[in-house]
Design a protein with these regions (language model features):
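Helical "lid/coupling" subdomains associated with nucleotide-phosphate turnover
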Residues: 42, 56, 80-114, 122, ...
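A short acidic-Thr-Gly-centered motif at the start of a beta-strand
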Residues: 27-37, 188-197
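Beta-propeller domains
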Residues: 63-72
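Short extracytoplasmic
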Residues: 40-64
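Hydrophobic alpha-helical cores of multi-pass transmembrane domains in eukaryotic membrane proteins
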Residues: 13-20, 47, 478-482
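Extracellular juxtamembrane-to-transmembrane boundary of type I single-pass membrane glycoproteins
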Residues: 1-9, 29-36, 458-477
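Helix-loop boundary elements of multi-pass alpha-helical membrane proteins
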Residues: 1-13, 39, 490-497
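Membrane-embedded alpha-helices of multi-pass membrane proteins, especially ion channels
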Residues: 18-31, 52, 56, 482-491
């Protein structure tokens, strides 16, 4: 009887010791925490054709597969036109500089003082400066130098101030759209960043003031080669991205081309515009239209000549004049051709349309997804509405409201006649401004790409218990388990005799 009791007691201590050992090991391994080395910051100035926007991004100092996990923490719009307008109006220039300083001060307040000197700051100028460089390279260089001088005077770590290419702008926009949609990384059940299983990328459609960009993944066409393709590596994976930028086909510059076509076909300085609503009239100097490198000046061009524009509210006439500025004939009878003779692989998959595309859809009171038929009928009704009714029914500033009939017809022509979206593939487009409170803009993709250059710092491992305590518990309960096992064996042997 005593031997059975001893054996039972030994078995109890053995099982208890093993259970405690397992519990201690689980706590030590699974309850460990990582002490992050903290956040890092980056600043991007998006110097667009119509305005400058300051973005502040942050990411953990440790990175996933060599690319930082970046989030937008601040977005500040600089009042005034884009930097390409510097030097035209001294008073306006000063207002723009003052507003830019206000935005920079907001970033100073957001970035901890001890991290400001290591926080990189970049300026990327887009189509407005690309046009100015074509028109006046000396002026564009002077503006970039003045911006660099200003950025170097700040407490941040200046990296560069440059004009990015249209293809880079399109690629960075594609990276932004897919990053925000979670197509590169997502958090799993253990709160770790992983690549989504079977993730598909979305194409991006960007409509700025002076250029428009399209980008999407597509297999390389061996018969064409690598024209328009870029291979990009993000979060440990490679992607073949087709991207193209059309300079002078941004919403504002394309409207100047429409106005130029109307003015040159008019026999007087009074110009009927089918894209302006009935009841809207305005005057402007010819320089506002023909001063752009995107328009062709007439033989008898007088910059100061006043042109009187009269709205006729004709949706069919508006679409016809908008289509006339696209070189569609050069792609006639050619496969894989968008317009202006530019190669483009077949459209496939989902797309994210942002910037001017989004604002046009929002102005027409459409949601993020709608059919091509709904877009056409809404645009037709909008274009047929007189100026008085538009002002009463749309809470949009008049400077923008007058042009949304043109914008709607431009978006239709670009997407359907240019990029070759059909009634079916149109349904794959989402018109959005932001995702998860992050703006859809090329600047985030720019920051993600540049964060590859910023070294990662390792996390500091913090365990639930000190190593000496863990070792002591491990030794004590291991010894107890061994002794219990020995005592159990002895008890069982004795019970046999």
């Amino acid at each position: 009887m005593a031997s059975k009791f001893s054996a039972g007691l030994a078995l109890f201590f053995l099982l208890a010791s093993v259970a405690v050992l397992i519990a201690v090991a689980i706590v030590q391994v699974h309850k460990r925490s990582y002490e992050s080395p903290g956040l890092r910051y980056g600043i991007v100035l998006d110097a667009g054709s119509s305005r400058t926007t300051v973005y502040l991004y942050q990411w953990p100092a440790e990175k996933e597969n060599n690319t930082g996990v970046v989030n937008q923490t601040l977005r500040c719009l600089v009042d005034g036109p884009g930097i390409s307008s510097f030097g035209q109006d001294a008073i306006q220039d000063q207002k723009t500089w003052n507003s830019m300083a206000d935005c920079i001060n907001r970033t100073k307040q957001a970035v901890p003082l001890d991290l400001q000197s290591s926080t990189p700051i970049f300026l990327g100028a887009t189509a407005g400066m690309r046009l100015l460089r074509i028109q006046n390279e000396t002026a564009s260089d002077e503006i970039l130098r003045s911006m660099e001088k200003y950025l170097r005077s700040l407490p941040f770590n200046f990296q560069n101030a440059s004009i990015i290419s249209g293809e880079e702008e399109g690629l960075y926009g594609w990276i932004t759209a897919n990053y925000l949609m979670g197509n590169f990384l997502e958090r799993n059940l253990w709160n770790a960043w992983v690549r989504p299983h079977g993730a598909q990328t979305v194409g991006s459609l960007d409509l700025g003031g002076a250029s428009t960009q399209i980008a999407f993944t597509a297999p390389l066409d061996e018969g064409i080669g690598t024209e328009g393709y870029t291979r990009v590596r993000l979060y440990g994976y490679e992607y073949n991205v087709y991207t193209h930028s059309f300079l002078c086909y941004g919403k504002n510059e394309a409207e100047k081309r429409v106005l130029a076509a109307l003015a040159q076909s008019s026999s007087s300085t009074t110009v009927e515009n089918p894209c302006f609503p009935v009841g809207f009239n305005t005057s402007m100097p010819a320089a506002n239209i023909f001063g752009s490198p995107c328009t062709q000046q007439p033989p008898s061009y007088d910059p100061g000549q006043q042109l009187h524009l009269v709205g006729t509210g004709d949706p069919a006439g508006c679409r016809a004049i908008v289509q006339s500025i696209f070189d569609l004939a050069s792609c006639h009878g050619r496969a894989n051709c968008s317009f202006a003779g530019v190669y483009q692989p077949d459209i496939s998959g989902d797309f994210m349309a942002y910037a001017g595309f989004y604002y046009t859809a929002a102005a027409l009171k459409l949601g993020s997804s709608f059919t091509l038929e709904a877009f056409n009928s809404t645009a037709w009704a909008f274009c047929s509405t007189n100026w008085t009714s538009l002002k009463e029914n749309y809470a949009i500033r008049e400077i923008y409201l007058k042009s949304y009939c043109y914008s709607a017809n431009y978006v239709y022509t670009l997407l359907v006649e240019g990029y070759k979206f059909t009634a079916d593939t149109w349904n794959n487009i989402q018109f959005k401004k932001e995702v998860k409170k992050n703006s859809i803009a090329w600047s985030l993709g720019y920051m993600l790409t540049l964060s590859n250059m910023i070294p990662a710092e390792a996390k500091l491992l913090r365990l639930p218990m000190d190593n000496s305590v863990f070792a002591g518990l491990l030794f004590m309960f291991s010894a107890l388990a061994i002794l219990s096992l020995m005592f159990l064996i002895i008890s069982l042997v004795r019970s046999c005799y």
